[in-house]
A protein has these predicted regions:
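A transmembrane-helix-recognition feature enriched in membrane-embedded lipid enzymes
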Residues: 2-66, 114-115
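Soluble catalytic domains of membrane acyltransferases
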Residues: 59-132
Length: 132
């Protein structure tokens, strides 16, 4: 019975995760459309939506985030890191308003690529000298 419950719980979390991604994808599309696709008007709202999305994903996936040290809140800054897994993106994105830099290939990924585009991700083509 426990194995069946664990399987059901994992499938339930996966379903919630997919629903959450679709909800934020549609929300981003609506916001971009309402403001006529003008990035200067939607950048703050988009960053806030991306942060809320990351926090909700962490909660659904059972990820607990603990901050230690001298955390200064939402100040401007530039964070450079080499993440170990895709969960790192959720954790970092849920802590502060962020705009991510990503490889250009991510843009073509279904669902997550679309979310990255809506979140104003900066895409870098690492195959060209100009892009890298």
């Amino acid at each position: 019975m426990t194995a069946l419950y664990n399987l059901f719980f994992k499938l339930y979390r996966l379903f919630l995760f997919l629903c959450l991604n679709i909800f934020f994808l549609l929300s981003g599309l609506i916001i971009k459309t309402l403001f006529f696709l003008r990035e200067e008007k939607t950048a703050g709202t988009t960053a806030l939506l991306a942060m809320l999305w990351a926090q909700a994903c962490c909660r659904i996936l059972g990820i607990r985030v603990t901050l230690s040290g001298n955390y200064q809140g939402f100040k401007l800054g530039f964070i450079v890191c080499n993440h170990i897994s895709y969960l790192d993106i959720l954790v970092m994105g849920g802590i502060r308003l962020s705009i991510f830099v990503s490889k250009i290939e991510v843009k073509k990924w279904p669902l997550l690529g679309w979310l990255a585009v809506l979140a104003n991700t900066i895409f870098i083509d690492r195959k060209t000298k100009k892009g890298a």
